[in-house]
Amino acid sequence: MDSAVDGPRQPPARAGSRLCTRCGERKAALKRPKTLEQICRECFYVVFEDEIHQTIVDNNLFKPGDRVAIGASGGKDSTVLAYVLSELNRRHKYCLDLFLLSVDEGITGYRDDSLETVKRNEIQYGLPLKIVSYKDLYGWTMDDIVKAIGLKNNCTFCGVFRRQALDRGAALLKVDKIVTGHNADDIAETVLLNILRGDIARLSRCTFITTGEDGPIPRCKPFKYTYEKEIVMYAYFKKLDYFSTECIYSPNAYRGFAREFIKDLERMRPRAILDIIKSGENFRISTTTRMPEQGTCERCGYISSQKLCKACVLLDGLNRGLPKLGIGRTKGIAGGDGDCEQQATRSERNRSSLQGKHGNFDF
């Protein structure tokens, strides 16, 4: 997942005048964060790309002839993913048809700038680009949503809408798989967050390298074992064109604490990130709990275990002027328009009651 954790681009720390521990011929240019090996630039390219290739092969992520959409935001992770996957596709004859797929959330001063980077990547890598927008799909931009609800719950709307937008864009491209730039750091953070929240259901699947196999289009994470620092180093040495600004609506304080904690662990033990992922894989708890059967949303046709999908529930709240209608628990809302009416009535009644006792509240 793309994030600007490193601030302005800085050259990686050099490894002094020692020789590369792999080839023994060229001077070492960096110390690998994952292994602490001091290696030259050329050997770094080789091991970085080979490890990703091995991950793809070991997990059977693709088969010849697959049409694959690369979730492209213009950030470092998705840019490196597009570049490396293009190279590996040619070198190892994966025989994949690759596409860039971007989502325009409608964030002025952020997404419009990053999409310019993606458009340059389209030309640089020779990959067709498809852009889908919140405005076209939902009638709202994130700028509009933030004006309506403020900053507190905006990531909930964006996460739900973005996931569905990627699926809808992928369906338009008729692809077999979506690949995303989620890296080892992202997955380790998610493992830790799910443990802290006690979310066993998400913990059981957050380390899967392929998800959504029961959904419309499976998603793969070729960077599952790739360190964020090494992605930054690769992009720097290769002089790749990427966008490095953080989303203006995404402070993500809770995840930020998890990220800093993992960085502290990594400084003490470089393998800490992989150890956390391994722990998450071994933490899967078998359960006899029956999962809800997947159906389709009565309104938009998207996959859902309820009558209305989460996106339609959230949109219902926005369009009714009750943007918090779909936040948190949605039991009762998902049952259809009648339930939405009841929930809206309850929300209005509760708001009136609270205002009568305590004055105005920002609901």
From Swiss-Prot:
GO terms for biological process: protein urmylation; tRNA wobble position uridine thiolation. Pfam families: ATP_bind_3, zn-ribbon_14. Residues 337-363 are annotated as: Disordered. Pathway: tRNA modification; 5-methoxycarbonylmethyl-2-thiouridine-tRNA biosynthesis. GO terms for molecular function: nucleotidyltransferase activity; tRNA binding. Its main location: cytoplasm. It comes from the Eukaryota. Keywords: Cytoplasm, RNA-binding, Transferase, tRNA processing, tRNA-binding. Belongs to the TtcA family. CTU1/NCS6/ATPBD3 subfamily. HAMAP family: CTU1 (MF_03053). This is Cytoplasmic tRNA 2-thiolation protein 1. It comes from Oryza sativa subsp. japonica.
